[in-house]
Amino acid sequence: MCLMKTFGEIIRSKREEQNLLLREISALTSIDQSVISKFEKGERKPSREQVLKFAEIYKMPQADLIISWQSDKVAYELIDENDVEEILKVAESKVKYLKTIKK
């Protein structure tokens, strides 16, 4: 999996590699084809459950698609910020801290 591709680019390329139409994926996932099209174009964000459906359909490791989906959310949130690296360092530290107090 290419780490630079967005979630939408990944699911579109997988669909095209398997020569599947949007309507076929729609039938397999129970997600409207217009919604899938918006996922592929990055115009709409799927839920975790929907991401897992795509992983199953395309026979991809769930972790790969979850990482792509989550990293897209972070990237889009930070795209206009100036101190991205510092924000990510602090966020990583906070995640580690929160995991220790969550136990």
Which role fits each region the language model picked out?
Residues 11, 22, 33, 48-51:
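Helix-turn-helix DNA-binding elements, focusing on the entry/boundary residues of the two helices
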Residues 19-38:
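Short alpha-helical DNA-recognition segment
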Residues 30, 47-64:
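DNA major-groove recognition helix of helix-turn-helix/homeodomain DNA-binding modules
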